[in-house]
Amino acid sequence: MASLDNLVARYQRCFNDQSLKNSTIELEIRFQQINFLLFKTVYEALVAQEIPSTISHSIRCIKKVHHENHCREKILPSENLYFKKQPLMFFKFSEPASLGCKVSLAIEQPIRKFILDSSVLVRLKNRTTFRVSELWKIELTIVKQLMGSEVSAKLTAFKTLLFDTPEQQTTKNMMSLINPDDEYLYEIEIEYTGKPESLTAADIIKIKNTVLTLISPNHLMLTAYHQAIEFIASHILSSEILLARIKSGKWGLKRLLPQVKSMTKADYMKFYPPVGYYITDKADGIRGIAVIQDTQIYVVADQLYSLGTTGIEPLKPTILDGEFMPEKKEFYGFDVIMYEGNLLTQQGFETRIESLSKGIKVLQAFNIKAEMKPFISLTSADPNVLLKNFESIFKKKTRPYSIDGIILVEPGNSYLNTNTFKWKPTWDNTLDFLVRKCPESLNVPEYAPKKGFSLHLLFVGISGELFKKLALNWCPGYTKLFPVTQRNQNYFPVQFQPSDFPLAFLYYHPDTSSFSDIDGKVLEMRCLKREINHVSWEIVKIREDRQQDLKTGGYFGNDFKTAELTWLNYMDPFSFEELAKGPSGMYFAGAKTGIYRAQTALISFIKQEIIQKISHQSWVIDLGIGKGQDLGRYLDAGVRHLVGIDKDQTALAELVYRKFSHATTRQHKHATNIYVLHQDLAEPAKEISEKVHQIYGFPKEGASSIVSNLFIHYLMKNTQQVENLAVLCHKLLQPGGMVWFTTMLGERVLELLHENRIELNEVWEARENEVVKFAIKRLFKEDILQETGQEIGVLLPFSNGDFYNEYLVNTAFLIKIFKHHGFSLVQKQSFKDWIPEFQNFSKSLYKILTEADKTWTSLFGFICLRKN
């Protein structure tokens, strides 16, 4: 790639080159990242300036001959021209705000007529040329490309669409005559038409900025903004690959900085009590980096904010991380990257915080409104002390800003690897959506109109890769709202469709709202109420600061993952009191120890083998799915739609986290669309069935399979519960559908207790190296297995030494009830039968399988039933 000055010099020399005297020499400026919205913005801006313009139609056929582009072009209604186009040099502007701007020097040389063949590329071009001056003309071209069989099949139709519109084409009506859904390309080019010797690099930069300013009046500010981000990145990143992403604009400030994670109960349980952590308040501001660079003082946030200068003498750089209040130009620092030229990113937070206060004082010395956030180091695990610490931060009324949450910072890690968590009250959790008015006449039942309201659809942004891995589909009406060129990009809008509320993207906007015209805008919204298949949304504000971002075609509100993880705070509310006392309802929170490795691997192997039996099925329901321990197995099996049901909201929230973890870190051949339903399975089958059938897209005939791993003992309290379970399975399954249960076998447990003469309230134990590994406490006195209601206490690998009560499963009674409700027994098998297969699967793990492991495993079994 040449420098811009060298390219201009080469251009000027071309006119003195005798070998090029019959050639057309072209110097063009091209913008390579143009979508319909950007194209339309520039077009309408030029029309509004009443610049002289002409419209032309042409068909260019391009044939590759010895790596050269041989062209036949017909500018209607003229004759065909034959020429070859040869590039000589190019220069590409590196700043992201230039939209891939490239200066190209090329020559066109006349050639003989040639014959077209099936390899030809056909480009139909509808071009409007704006003569902005004697030196420059700006060409805006709508292009349709056809190749191979498309040429004969579609050429005539697209000639009509592009050239022979019902209404005569003018610059004022052109944008209304072209349908952006017809898979067009959009090109903006600037061609130099002045005297070659008069051209300078500065002229090129000036006209380039003229066009970019039409797209964004703040283009020059955006360029400075990206340069500031590059400066910050140069002190944070060491990888040239990552720095290149910053320079290209693929990464912005948000991707560069370590992100604060919305904290769930499951997150907190992993490090509760948070001894050693630092806490501070969450201000209702925006993330910003305060920088002293040479003589300039500025903040990089959603844009570049200049705060002043240091005077004539340049200072060594200082870079602080914090929250910024744009209206008051106030900065509140919570971390430091560099202080007076000393890079601090590899130090732990407990060390960096010492330099943070010094950096704040430097800003204050230049009359900048800056302050260090108040931090408390947590030193006690006592819940009462923790409560006082959290209250002193969250309920402090003397702060100069409103507080909407608490930040917890982990010590001991580098700047980029510091884990920072954010807790907010449910009410203060909001999401940013791109809002579009729902197209009319879609005839979609879920889009039913409501009197006094207008239906709008809520969208967020998603990468093409994540869209595929989550097996998402576009909602009805999507293609009417977004042109195909936007849909074909690597990052595009998608309806907000969280796993527990697939129709959360529906928003009924009141006709009486003070927010009148919201179509096409980014709104900050909060959830007021969650009902079956309906969410009541409230508008907090219009994000006016995001409207320019929309024009780039790369921003559509929150990212899908960020939006759904934030949404979890509505699904599983995390109270302020739980910060001190620890999260409530954390069933099976403990971790397994190493002594369970082989036995756990055996159980996992068996569940994997069972789930593989339902591979590639369309709809599968998991009863008691918990936090998704089997999610990876369903993904490996290629299940297309998975409905997970559980009454534990915290577990379901963890499942959603796992959904994204699998999508970003594991490779699966097939994608699975995951739905979760917060539901107590002991409630009436009719009510549960109705909720499942209301899941968007769930088939009327029912699911292919129902799976329940190690859960049904919760539903063996009485006969009514077992009957209810059988009825539920019958209502949810299609004819011929299968039920797959894994469970502890009640008859085998009773046999074990009898063999070891375990009486009421006594405990059977299996020890390993004097450590109790497995244990069952007898909580019933009957000598024979009852149909239901017999309790035992079980010591589980992850229960931290506590016994969990459950009911014995009388499998004969269970099968009897299911047969009564229209099922047939397909298979019943003990887990011990899988041990030989496990030996073949992993000889190394089998070798460390102990007798206690084998005894414990033999207590479990598998039951398969088919709906008649």
From Swiss-Prot:
InterPro entries per UniProt: CYTH-like_dom_sf, mRNA_G-N7_MeTrfase_dom, RG7MT1, SAM-dependent_MTases_sf
Pathway(s) the chain acts in: mRNA processing; mRNA capping
Site entry: mRNA cap binding: 627, 658, 713, 806
Catalytic activity: a 5'-end triphospho-ribonucleoside in mRNA + H2O = a 5'-end diphospho-ribonucleoside in mRNA + phosphate + H(+); a 5'-end diphospho-ribonucleoside in mRNA + GTP + H(+) = a 5'-end (5'-triphosphoguanosine)-ribonucleoside in mRNA + diphosphate; a 5'-end (5'-triphosphoguanosine)-ribonucleoside in mRNA + S-adenosyl-L-methionine = a 5'-end (N(7)-methyl 5'-triphosphoguanosine)-ribonucleoside in mRNA + S-adenosyl-L-homocysteine
Induction line: Expressed in the early phase of the viral replicative cycle.
The keyword Nucleotide-binding appears for this protein: yes
Keyword annotations from UniProtKB, A to Z: Early protein, GTP-binding, Hydrolase, Methyltransferase, mRNA capping, mRNA processing, Nucleotide-binding, Nucleotidyltransferase, RNA-binding, S-adenosyl-L-methionine, Transferase, Virion
EC number of the protein: 3.6.1.74, 2.7.7.50, 2.1.1.56
Role, per record: Probably catalyzes the second reaction in the mRNA cap formation pathway. Forms a covalent complex with GTP.
Subunit-level organization: Part of the viral DNA-directed RNA polymerase that consists of 8 polII-like subunits (RPB1, RPB2, RPB3, RPB5, RPB6, RPB7, RPB9, RPB10), a capping enzyme and a termination factor.
Protein's UniProt name: mRNA-capping enzyme
